[in-house]
């Protein structure tokens, strides 16, 4: 098999409105879909841990980009199981966005109160350069920003 591309990345959240404040309002992603979906049919009984009747799903992306989009599902009024994982645990530990100006973005996010674990200086190398840094979203999920050069 040869896949054409990654279609989307779905990350379950506890509070979709708080998640939207971060991804839409702070990171300037665009909401391309916001819907309540029926989860009672099809393969849902095999792909869900608990029975749920509906879910709210939001698709987020950047209008000018053709890269994969994020899907943010949640079940309003129903708390999900589990905790976010760290980089050395099994599962999807983080996702990363390539940006042009890391130092400016780091300053902007810090000014908006976004949690940068250890502070931005923790991510600088011995020459004081910044090739990437992580933040925590409202659910404690690691989100990385990098230069796109694989360093």
Sequence positions of predicted segments:
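Vicinal oxygen chelate
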Residues: 2, 11, 34, 97-151
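Beta-rich catalytic cores
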Residues: 5
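Eukaryotic phosphotyrosine signaling hubs
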Residues: 8, 90-94
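Core segments of cupin and vicinal oxygen chelate
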Residues: 12-67
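A cross-kingdom feature marking solvent-exposed beta-strand/loop segments within repeated
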Residues: 40-44, 81, 125
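Exposed loop/turn and edge beta-strand positions of beta-sandwich/beta-sheet ligand-binding modules
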Residues: 53-54, 91, 129
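Short, charged/polar surface micro-motifs in flexible loops or helix N-caps
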Residues: 65-68, 77-80, 102
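Acetyl-CoA-dependent GNAT
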Residues: 73-78, 148
